[in-house]
Amino acid sequence: MYRMQLLSCIALSLALITNSAPTSSSTKKTQLQLEHLLLDLQMLLNGINNYKNPKLTRMLTFKFYMPKKATELKHLQCLEEELKPLEEVLNLAQSKNFHLRDTRDIISNINVLVLELKGSETTFTCEYDDDTATIIEFLNGWITFCQSIISTLT
């Protein structure tokens, strides 16, 4: 219950810090969008890692594809391609004791942010790693990607 308020507080703090930094407006916008994407991914991961999640072991059986090397915003195309399977796994895991609030809204937010960040380029083809990832590895991988890109913008 308080987690959502804490994440909102962090998001607002990051927005204030970002807006006061002496960077170009497009860089500020990109950084802010990445920070929102990061928070959405962390919210999903926190919900999955919740100790009350009785379906975690089932969720871990589903596999996701990760890009071989994600270092640029265009690689977000790979995340976009895995959003539908991610949403389906999250919806399967819903139960009386475990419910990721607003899963559809979070996935929708992620999709909008990814589309804005990667731009309209649709010719990029993802090269996926040979090994698949669990849902936790998948989310952690994209969280690390966001943190890495944010660190290069500051």
UniProtKB/Swiss-Prot annotation:
Alphabetical GO CC annotations of the entry are: extracellular space
Stretches that traverse the bilayer: none
The answer to whether UniProt assigns keyword Metal-binding to this entry is no
User: Which pairs are disulfide-linked?
Assistant: 78-126
Predominant subcellular localization, coarse grouping = secreted
For this protein, the record's InterPro entries field holds: 4_helix_cytokine-like_core, IL-2, IL-2_CS
Keyword Cytoplasm part of the UniProt annotation: no
Q: Which residues are glycosylated?
A: 23
GO BP, one example? Answer: negative regulation of inflammatory response
Gene Ontology molecular function terms on file: cytokine activity; growth factor activity; interleukin-2 receptor binding
Question: Where's it found, cell-wise?
Answer: Secreted
Q: Which residues form the signal peptide?
A: 1-20
> Which keywords describe this protein according to UniProt?
Adaptive immunity, Cytokine, Disulfide bond, Glycoprotein, Growth factor, Immunity, Secreted, Signal
What family does this belong to?
Answer: Belongs to the IL-2 family.
**PANTHER family assigned:** INTERLEUKIN-2
Q: What does this protein do?
A: Cytokine produced by activated CD4-positive helper T-cells and to a lesser extend activated CD8-positive T-cells and natural killer (NK) cells that plays pivotal roles in the immune response and tolerance. Binds to a receptor complex composed of either the high-affinity trimeric IL-2R (IL2RA/CD25, IL2RB/CD122 and IL2RG/CD132) or the low-affinity dimeric IL-2R (IL2RB and IL2RG). Interaction with the receptor leads to oligomerization and conformation changes in the IL-2R subunits resulting in downstream signaling starting with phosphorylation of JAK1 and JAK3.
Annotated protein name in UniProt: Interleukin-2
Species, as recorded: Aotus nancymaae (Ma's night monkey)
